[in-house]
């Protein structure tokens, strides 16, 4: 768990004290600049999730408005069982729960721009790192990741899946990446046509 606060050398206790009271096994403190963030959080170019190691690193992200404790407990048990058995290929998997300051995001009306998920507060994403070993294992990973996400989705009470396009597994559809409202899709497609008329940047999860 990372607590990162801008403009101070030590994160204020009002944020850390409730978690420190739980008696963590270890805590580490550091101070630096914005450029240190990737290193602190394990996503620099030298860290495993971002290196070309031959591993598969599928994520299954979902935006949430709040945590559903029942769903969280179910996901915890499923993830624990899948990653801790002696024969599991997913022993290097991890689970990201991301929450950021929302003041700037929510300063705009949710319909002011084509970005769809201003009302969401959290991003959850299991990262199932494993060594590829055929399509059967790929399916196991896909089934596991989607099952985890489905539990969180069901617990959210939402009627459409909200996903973070940069983490997306790839089977979510454009409505999950960019919002289910037709006008958002049309606006993004219009901008795509305006700024990239020759589709030079139509690689992963394209809007058009």
Language-model region placement:
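Soluble FAD-dependent oxygen oxidases
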Residues: 1-208
């Amino acid at each position: 768990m990372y607590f990162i606060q801008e403009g101070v050398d030590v994160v204020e206790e009002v944020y850390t004290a409730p978690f420190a009271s739980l008696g963590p096994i270890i805590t580490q403190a550091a101070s630096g600049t914005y450029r240190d963030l990737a290193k602190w959080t394990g996503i620099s170019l030298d860290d495993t999730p971002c290196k070309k190691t031959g591993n598969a690193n599928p994520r299954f992200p979902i935006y949430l408005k709040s945590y559903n404790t029942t769903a969280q407990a179910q996901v915890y048990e499923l993830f624990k069982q899948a990653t801790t058995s002696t024969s599991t290929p997913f022993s290097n998997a991890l689970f990201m729960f991301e929450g950021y300051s929302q003041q700037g995001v929510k300063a705009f009306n949710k319909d002011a721009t084509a970005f769809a998920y201003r009302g969401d507060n959290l991003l959850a994403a299991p990262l199932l790192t494993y060594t590829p070993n055929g399509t059967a294992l790929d399916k196991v990973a896909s089934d596991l990741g989607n099952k985890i996400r489905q539990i969180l989705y069901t617990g959210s009470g939402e009627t459409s899946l909200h996903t973070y396009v940069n983490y997306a597994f790839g089977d979510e559809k454009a409505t999950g990446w960019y919002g289910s409202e037709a006008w958002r899709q049309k606006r993004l497609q219009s901008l795509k046509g305006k700024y990239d008329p020759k589709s030079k940047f139509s690689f992963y999860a394209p809007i058009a």
